Curated annotation (Swiss-Prot):
Gene designation per UniProt: CFAP45
Subunit details: Microtubule inner protein component of sperm flagellar doublet microtubules. Interacts with AK8; dimerization with AK8 may create a cavity at the interface of the dimer that can accommodate AMP. Interacts with CFAP52. Interacts with ENKUR. Directly interacts with DNALI1. Interacts with DNAH11. Interacts with DNAI1.
Region (Disordered), start-end ranges: 1-29, 388-416
Function: Microtubule inner protein (MIP) part of the dynein-decorated doublet microtubules (DMTs) in cilia axoneme, which is required for motile cilia beating. It is an AMP-binding protein that may facilitate dynein ATPase-dependent ciliary and flagellar beating via adenine nucleotide homeostasis. May function as a donor of AMP to AK8 and hence promote ADP production.
Tissue expression pattern: Expressed in respiratory cells (at protein level).
GO biological process: flagellated sperm motility
Compartment annotation: Cytoplasm, Cytoskeleton, Cilium axoneme; Cytoplasm, Cytoskeleton, Flagellum axoneme; Cell projection, Cilium; Cell projection, Cilium, Flagellum
Stored PANTHER family: CILIA- AND FLAGELLA-ASSOCIATED PROTEIN 45, NASOPHARYNGEAL EPITHELIUM SPECIFIC PROTEIN 1
Protein name in the entry: Cilia- and flagella-associated protein 45
Domain of life: Eukaryota
Organism of derivation: Sus scrofa (Pig)
Residue ranges that the Swiss-Prot or TrEMBL entry lists as coiled coil: 119-232, 259-393, 434-522
GO cellular component term, pick one: axonemal microtubule
Keyword match Coiled coil: yes
Annotated family: Belongs to the CFAP45 family.
Length: 549
């Protein structure tokens, strides 16, 4: 289906946004190659093949549509269903005529070339290459033997023909190539390849780091400029705030002056009102003194009752101390309950005092109300209020005595319940202690039996292991004697093999060192900076004086 103009425009804007967001690409590898077949091949298309059509980039399609005057909204059909309305684009032919058509074989070749092999595939490919190289080496070795045999047969000091010279040169080149491929598979040369690749990567990375540092400097300069702009704006804001604070201080000063004037005026009014109230206070002072004397007598009486109650509590506490000597653990719980009872009683007394305080405040309120009405019926109302207050006080006293009596009765019942609970707790703890002692005795006997059985079992296993160790020691002595005889024979063979391997290793090291030096020279020839070449020589353990030109 061809792309619609709207789709081309949206894809173009999306591509441009992505190009702005991506970092700028810089070419690092100058020897990169591009598969030119992606841009259209010269090979004629076989009409019998099934073509695969690949659209080119959207920018080219958009330009083509604009040039041909076909950049318009495509024809659509509106499809109305039960739950939605859709517009379907009617497919048309490709108006540009620039679609790339390639054969299935070419498409499969490109797809296979773009495939990223896995680690297993790479290992399998490496094994296949290794086997192929070994086969080539074997073939070359066989051909070399044949050539030597032919040379020995035909050695008659006569000059070789041109064809024989070419064959000989070709065989030598093939043999040299096979030897080089075999050396490339050595671990040292593989490590050398990694070192060279690492040096190239370091050079690229340093160039990228330098570029990032330049970008960071530009960003820092821009950030510094923005900070300076923000600092100027902040100074202006501080100046505006100081002016606003100055105006507010002036307004507060004017407000204080107005308040002082108002306070002076109110002070004069309060002075006049205070003189009037002073006269009223003198009239009510005698009445208040009488009420205070009654309150003092009432407080003294309550104080005496409190002392009696405290004496009773002290007596109870003394009894508890005696019982505590006998049952220390149970007495702790009892003391806690007594203290809780005391706290509750003190709370009740506080409530009573609060009630008395409330009554006193009500009296003061009543006095204030009487003061407002004293001009009319001051004497008569005062006597009635005093009698009413006295009756209220008597009722409150009777109620308090009734509550105290009930509290004393509850206290006695609580103490009886506590004594009963203590006795039950003592009996329960004695029973629990006896049960626990019996359980401990049974557990001790069970553990003792298990330990005896374990000791017997361990003794049997120890005897069995001692017998096995004896047999194993005899077997080891026999094997040691056999191994000593075998080692004498192996040392002789190893010494001979070692001499041969030492000579081969020396030759191999010389060949590898030569290849390493050659690769370092090739690396210098690519134009890589000298410091990376020196680092590669150091990692490859190549002497510097032998590698520097």
């Amino acid at each position: 289906m061809p792309l619609s103009p709207a789709g081309v425009l949206s894809s173009t804007s999306t591509a441009s946004n992505r190009s702005r967001n991506r970092p700028r690409y810089r070419t690092k590898a100058l020897s990169s190659e591009v598969d030119e077949s992606l841009f259209g091949g010269i090979k004629p298309l076989n009409q019998s093949d099934s073509p695969i059509v690949l659209l080119r980039d959207k920018h080219a399609i958009r330009k083509t549509l604009t040039a041909l005057g076909l950049d318009h909204k495509p024809e659509t059909i509106q499809l109305i269903t039960r739950d939605m309305v859709r517009e379907l684009i009617i497919p048309t032919k490709d108006p540009s005529g620039e679609s790339l058509i390639m054969s299935p074989e070419e498409f499969e070749r490109i797809r296979w070339a773009s495939h990223v092999p896995t680690r297993e595939e790479l290992e399998a490919k490496e094994q296949a290459c290794k086997k192929e190289k070994e086969a080539i080496v074997d073939a070359v070795t066989t051909r070399k033997k044949i050539m030597k045999q032919k040379e020995m047969v035909s050695r008659n000091n006569q000059k070789l023909s041109d064809l024989e010279e070419v064959a000989k040169e070709r065989a030598q080149n093939l043999l040299q190539r096979a030897s080089q491929l075999r050396m490339e598979q050595e671990e040292e040369l593989k490590d050398m390849k990694k070192i060279i690749l690492n040096a190239k990567c370091h050079a690229i990375r340093d160039a990228q780091i330098l570029e990032k540092q330049l970008i960071q400097k530009e960003l820092d300069a821009e950030e510094k400029r923005l900070d300076q702009m923000m600092e100027v704006e902040r100074q202006k804001s501080i100046q505006r705030q100081e002016e606003l604070d100055k105006k507010r201080r002036e307004e507060r000063i004017r407000g204080r002056r107005h308040i002082v004037e108002q306070m002076e005026k109110n002070q004069e009014e309060r002075s006049l009102l205070a003189e009037q109230r002073e006269q009223e206070k003198e009239q009510m002072l005698e009445y208040m003194e009488q009420l205070q004397e009654e309150d003092l007598r009432d407080l003294e009486r309550r104080h005496q009752q409190k002392l009696k109650m405290q004496a009773e509590i002290k007596r109870i506490n003394d009894e508890n101390q005696k019982q505590k000597a006998e049952l220390l653990a149970q007495e702790k719980l009892a003391d806690q309950m007594v203290m809780e009872f005391t706290k509750k009683k003190m709370a009740r007394e506080a409530e009573f005092e609060a009630e008395q305080e409330r009554i006193r405040r009500e009296k003061e309120k009543e006095i204030s109300r009487l003061r407002a009405l004293q001009e009319k019926v001051q004497d008569y109302q005062a006597e009635q209020d005093a009698l009413r207050a006295k009756r209220n006080q008597e009722v409150a006293d009777r109620e308090w005595r009734r509550k105290e009596k009930e509290n004393a009765q509850k206290k006695m019942e609580t103490e009886a319940q506590l004594r009963k609970s203590r006795l039950e707790q003592v009996a329960f703890k004695e029973h629990s202690l006896a049960v626990q002692v019996q359980r401990d005795r049974d557990e001790f006997e069970r553990i003792l039996r298990a330990q005896r059985e374990q000791i017997e079992k361990e003794q049997q296993e120890e005897e069995k292991k001692a017998m096995e160790r004896l047999q194993h020691a005899n077997e080891l002595r026999r094997q040691v004697r056999e191994n000593q005889q075998k080692q004498v024979q192996d040392r002789i063979a190893i010494f001979e093999e070692g001499q041969r391997l030492k000579e081969e290793a020396q030759k191999r090291r010389e060949r590898i060192e030569g290849i390493k030096k050659k690769k370092i020279e090739e690396l210098r020839a690519t134009g890589l900076p000298e410091k990376y070449c020196i680092e590669a020589e150091r990692k490859a353990n190549i002497p510097t004086n032998t590698s520097v030109n």
